[in-house]
From Swiss-Prot:
Non-catalytic subunit of the tRNA-splicing endonuclease complex, a complex responsible for identification and cleavage of the splice sites in pre-tRNA. It cleaves pre-tRNA at the 5' and 3' splice sites to release the intron. The products are an intron and two tRNA half-molecules bearing 2',3' cyclic phosphate and 5'-OH termini. There are no conserved sequences at the splice sites, but the intron is invariably located at the same site in the gene, placing the splice sites an invariant distance from the constant structural features of the tRNA body. Keywords: Membrane, Mitochondrion, Mitochondrion outer membrane, Nucleus, tRNA processing. One of its GO terms (cellular component) is endomembrane system. Residues 1-32, 374-413 are annotated as: Disordered. It comes from Saccharomyces cerevisiae (strain ATCC 204508 / S288c). This is tRNA-splicing endonuclease subunit SEN54. The tRNA splicing endonuclease complex is present with 100 molecules/cell. Present with 531 molecules/cell in log phase SD medium. Signal peptide: none annotated. PANTHER family: TRNA-SPLICING ENDONUCLEASE SUBUNIT SEN54. The gene is SEN54. Residues 18-29 have a biased composition (Acidic residues). Residues 401-413 have a biased composition (Basic residues).
Length: 467
């Protein structure tokens, strides 16, 4: 029989074992942190006390019970928490069906630095893949609206909140969905992407503008191009055939293999700036249907400008191997794609860093560096002389500490040429949702001496020393 007082915590019992249990509970260390956080109004938030780690099962259900209580507390906290977004930070995007684009009436966010195009009214227009990407990451709320604009008299009933399933159903084709998957994957990695068919306000190109030739010059150039065979003259074209082996005698095996250069017809791969410019001038006479590349890709950097992005670092072509409407590019189409490349060619030894690219790229048929200097002339005149001197000293200090391209030995340079090639682009192959990136590059194995030449003189000297 037990008796408990109303004003005291003392408990009397006739069982002596109960007193021993009470003494053990008093000796245990009690955790008052949770109770103190409830009592104190200004108490700092802290993690609850954790128990001792069990290194092996103890044969009871105590561990399962502790895990169940912990997971239940977590799910109860999540389910009972207040969900929503701050009205001030909410950004709504409206899908425009007849343009297959989206518009943000009140755009704000860091994504505006690399995505979208602003119009004169201050509204930001997004491509559909940009719209889906921002909605998928939770940056904007997607709405369906028949007429989007700055009309304030539009009713709220015309705005329908779209789910991700609704957005995916708005893709016009499987090819567009494949392009979005590649776009979203590279954006999550931090790259900056723009469609290849979307020109910036300031177009930068590695090649200067072509001068229009007269009809007589065009006809003459076309006739001469017919007789141009891999840097061989017209008179040596006869020996560019199997008859070469009848008119010339070969006494050694190396001569025979070297003669294959004239027998096997190959393609001249541009290896420097001059050859690139010559190949671009010959491209206007090719009558091959161009396959446009899909994306221009820039490495992430803080000075990127949508109006003047500069030359891209990579160019990507998206191909779905399971789509019957698409096909892998043929040899002629690949040749045309290589000739249409316009990016920062990494194999050029004449260009060592980004500053050299500003000099070797063109905007409106003038070097990009000169164009930037003219554009910033107005802002420079407004600056004081002291700030101009400080900026000049800063630029000279940066140029003096500029790292140049590392020089490699000849055999390593040859391995790099054989491995990476020259002009290149990336093919993003879609296979049932899986993306594989394959680098397609031009190589010139025929001009590289890949055979081994033993140094017999050293072996003879070593044998002579032994004897």
């Amino acid at each position: 029989m037990q008796f408990a007082g109303k004003k005291t915590d003392q408990v009397t019992t006739s069982n002596p074992g109960f007193e021993e249990e009470e003494e053990e509970e008093e000796e245990l260390q009690q955790d008052w942190s949770q109770l103190a956080s409830l009592v104190s109004k200004n108490a700092a938030l802290s993690l609850p006390k954790r128990g001792e780690k069990d290194y092996e099962p103890d044969g009871t259900n105590l561990q399962d019970l502790l895990l169940y209580n912990a997971s239940k507390a977590m799910f109860d906290t999540i389910s009972d928490s207040i969900r929503g977004t701050t009205v001030k930070s909410e950004v709504r995007g409206y899908y425009v069906p007849h343009k297959h684009q989206a518009v943000l009436l009140k755009p704000k966010g860091s994504f505006m630095q690399t995505m979208g195009r602003a119009d004169s009214t201050g509204e930001l227009w997004l491509d559909f893949h940009e719209f889906v990407y921002l909605a998928e990451r939770g940056t904007i709320l997607p709405y369906y609206r028949l007429e989007a604009g700055s009309n304030k008299s539009s009713k709220h009933e015309t705005e329908i909140l779209l789910s991700m399933e609704d957005l995916y159903s708005l893709f016009s084709s499987q090819q567009e969905m494949d392009q979005y998957f590649v776009f979203a994957h590279l954006k999550r990695l931090g790259f900056i992407l723009k469609p290849s068919n979307q020109e910036a306000a300031v177009k930068t190109s590695f090649f200067p503008l072509k001068k229009q030739r007269s009809n007589l010059q065009a006809i003459t150039w076309r006739l001469l191009s017919l007789f141009k065979i891999q840097e061989l003259s017209l008179f040596s074209g006869f020996f560019y055939s199997k008859w070469n082996f009848f008119f010339r005698k070969y006494t050694t095996s190396p001569q025979l293999y070297q003669g294959l250069n004239r027998l096997v017809r190959s393609v001249a791969v541009p290896k420097n700036k001059k050859e690139l410019l010559d190949a671009q001038s010959d491209r206007e006479f090719q009558k091959v249907k161009d396959i446009p590349l899909t994306f221009k890709v820039w490495k992430p950097h803080s000075n990127f400008k949508k109006r003047d992005p500069g030359l891209p670092d990579f160019q990507v072509f998206v191909y779905n191997k399971n789509d019957d409407l698409q096909h892998f590019p043929t040899y002629k189409e690949l040749r045309s794609m290589f000739s249409s490349l316009d990016y920062k060619f990494e194999f050029l030894s004449e260009i060592e860093d980004d500053d050299d690219w500003e000099t070797n790229s063109y905007v409106e048929d003038i070097p990009r560096k000169e164009y930037i200097h003219k554009r910033s002339a107005k802002s420079q005149t407004e600056k004081s002389e002291s700030s101009m001197k400080a900026s000049f000293q800063k630029k000279t200090a940066q140029s003096s500490t500029k790292k140049k391209r590392k020089a490699y030995p000849p055999h390593i340079q040859q391995n790099r040429r054989l491995k990476t090639g020259y002009r290149s682009f990336i093919i993003a192959i879609m296979d049932n949702g899986l993306i594989s990136f394959v680098k397609m590059s031009e190589a010139d194995f025929g001009s590289e001496s890949v055979w081994y030449t033993p140094n017999t003189q050293k072996k003879v000297d070593q044998r002579w020393k032994k004897h």
